[in-house]
Amino acid sequence: MATGTVRLHRVLRASPERIYRAFLEPDAIAKWLPPYGFTCQVDHMDARVGGTFRMSFRNFGTGNAHAFGGEYLELVPFEKIRYSDRFDDPNLPGKMLATIALRPVSCGTELDILQEGIPDVIPTEMCYLGWQESLLQLAKLVEPEIPD
């Protein structure tokens, strides 16, 4: 059964456009989404409503990987991303839903994340910690203004 829910709120010093791109470009998401100690391989990403994605996180220490994939349900450029995803592992059953809302503010972008349907075998607090780590890495990707 899948009942866990995680909510996060951040303000990043970057435009909504830059953050939106970071969620939908394979090279960018592979850099920031995996929590500390994990690498990411993006196998497929078709970032359009009805499009699908597939990727895996590999624990660098143990070598174990968890593959997952999903479908983009709603994409409002620079404002909202909503997608479903599920793990390949039958021990991690159920479909999760994630909603990312972006809102411009005076110093950058307000970011709200809601992830629902987290499998019961994944402690919600561990999922929350993973998202916190990922969002720190996202900030390091999108906040710097580096000239060419």
PLM feature spans:
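Intrinsic-disorder/low-complexity, polar/charged segments enriched in Ser/Thr/Lys/Arg/Asp/Glu/Gln
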Residues: 3-9, 16, 40, 52, ...
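Short amphipathic alpha-helical signal-transduction/dimerization elements
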Residues: 24, 135-143
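Beta-strand/loop substructures that line and gate deep hydrophobic ligand-binding cavities in soluble
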Residues: 82-132
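Glycine-rich portal/gate segments that line the openings of hydrophobic small-molecule binding cavities
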Residues: 41-84
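Short, highly charged C-terminal tails/helix-capping segments
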Residues: 42, 141-148
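Hydrophobic ligand-binding cavity/cleft-lining segments
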Residues: 1-39
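Hydrophobic pocket/interface hotspot
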Residues: 19, 29, 53, 72, ...
